[in-house]
Amino acid sequence: SAWSAGLSLSQAAFDITSRLQTIDETILNNDLPYRKLPQLQANGLFPTAHDPLEFTLGSEYVYFEHPEAGSPTLTVADNADRARSAAGVRYNFRRSWGHLVPSYSHRYRYYSIYGGPLDQQEPHLAVPVFNVDSGLLFDRLFQFRDHAFIQTLEPRLYYLYVPYRDQNHLPLFETAKNSFGFEQLFRDNRFTGGDRIGDANQVSL
C-alpha cells in the first residue's frame, strides 16, 4: 500500500498539480515500486481567435527513488529524474450532429539517471503523434406502448498514426500495457505511465 498527498491549482485554461507519494515500509525492498518524490504536472488548453483551433500543452516532472537502486543483485534501474511534455494543436470542430477533431502533438521524454555509464545517463526521445477523431449523431423518435422514446446512433471513426521509435535505451519506472477493451480503441497510447509511446497506424470503428 501507499499514501500520497496532492495539491492542485486551476484556472480557465491551465492547471498545475503536485503529488508526493511514499510506499508501505513493510513491503520487502525487492517488491517495492518506485517512490515519486515528488510528481509535478501542468496542463493547458489555449483557444485562439480562429475558433475552433486550439493549442494544448502537457508537462510532467517526476523524481523516481528506489531503496535498492544500483544494487548489483537487482534488475532495478537507478534513481532518476524524468521530464516529459506534449505540445500540440487541434481543430476542435463540434456540432449537434457530430464532430471532427484532427490533432497533432510532439511528445518528448528526457531522463537524468543517477549512476550507470556516462553515455547512458541522459537518454531522451521525441515522437510525433497524429490522430483524427470523427463521429456522427443520429436521433430518431419512436413510440412503444404509448410512450415516446429517442433512439440514438453514434458511429465513430478514429485514426491514429505514431511512427516507430526504438525505446530500448529508456528506463522503465511505471509503464505497462493497457488491458484491451473498447476504450483502448480510441486511446492514443497503448501503454500506461509515461515511459513508453506506442507506435501505431490504425483505424478504429
Language-model features, listed with the residues they occupy:
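Outer-membrane beta-barrel proteins and related beta-barrel translocases across Gram-negative bacteria
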Residues: 1-205
